[in-house]
Amino acid sequence: MERIIAQNRDEIMHIIRTSKNTQSACSQIQRQFEVGYIKAKQIINYLSMSPLQIQSQSSKFHDLIKIPEGFESLSQYFIARVNAGAELRYGLERVSCDNALHDRIEHEVKQICDLRFESYFLFIADLLHETFENMNIYHGPGRSSVAGSVVAYCLGMTDIDPLKYGLLFERFINPIGVSKVQIDIDVEYDERLRIVDYLKQNYGDDQLAHLIDLDLLAQKSAVIQVGKGLTFDIIGLRILSIMKECLKNIEHKYGSEITKSAMNPPKDDPQTFRLFQEAHTFGVFYFESDEMRRYLKILQPSTFEELIALNTMYRPRIIDCIDGYTKRKHGLEAITYDHPMMEKYLKETYGVIIYQEQLMLLSQEIANFTPEESDLLARAICHQRLTQSE
């Protein structure tokens, strides 16, 4: 509000100094007062609809985690949970001998503890365990940049091994970055409100909120910046409800129980890839549109990694890469690299830069960027692409 008043004062003083016509100056000053009044009223109106009590980002989640006996602090309990999860995910032998894995976990744990995000991670992990194991609600394997966290994988927050797919932690949490930390949880569409009710019963109505985004309010950005905090979104996906219903029908028809491991089938099944190659993907999340099915027939994907690449390229910013990627896969175009050091990171995608992780690793390898700096570079490049596409 003070900024608006100061801005209007400066505008009025400028009008007085530069105007040669008194009547014209009075008209301009009146309009300036009207503009300032409208802006102030909009902000007051917006704040009256959002009586937020802004607190420390992690303080609320700290209050929700109970530290078991035998642990002196939340950080100690968090580290113990991560280590136990690492042994389950990777095995005791690998955890003991793999220096790269040890260093990655240690690095992530330090960043998380420094930012006091331990309770945030534990809260999400406990919520997913409760909904999946005890409430029998299916959830997705992990969405967006949280999939780059080995700690999240060890805690059961995601089912994607970041080390296997070359995913980077700094895409999710960057101490020198500007984006807020947020985790999206995909759950069955029909069960979303059941999870909301569970949260209300266990943590109280005052701890939850249904959020909407009103794009027409230009002044909303100021409130959003002030109110940045740790949040998570529960997103209902119909495909998960359909998958669960299919498994129930199979059990009923064939009389055999389908375990939850069926939600993570082998990724090299020839019959499955034949369906993709023939574009029989109606109802398959991300692969059901007419244009995507056309690309599937042209690309003829034969590996899980190629499906990931096609899904990634099917975006306004980089959709033009599909043509070159497809030609290189089928030997219709030579695979080239602008620098010999690039082959290490681009070989899997036939020399085409598709992922932000590739940009980050290349900048670290060639320009000696830190992981945090490389994340900012990748974001800047992607933002530029988005601006140009618009």
Q: Residue locations for each model-derived region?
A:
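Helix-rich "cap/lid" substructures immediately adjacent to catalytic or cofactor-binding pockets
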Residues: 98-141
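Mg2+-dependent phosphoryl-transfer active-site scaffold
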Residues: 55-87, 109, 127-131, 137-142, ...
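Alpha-helix N-cap/helix-initiation sites
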Residues: 22, 37-41, 121, 139-143, ...
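Aromatic- and histidine-enriched alpha-helix N-cap/loop-to-helix transition segments
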Residues: 15, 119-122, 218, 354
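Conserved phosphate-coordination/catalytic loops
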Residues: 6, 118-122, 189-190
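Well-ordered alpha-helical segments embedded in enzymatic catalytic cores
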Residues: 11-14, 123-127, 194-195
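Terminal-proximal interaction/regulatory segments of ATP-powered molecular machines
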Residues: 2-56
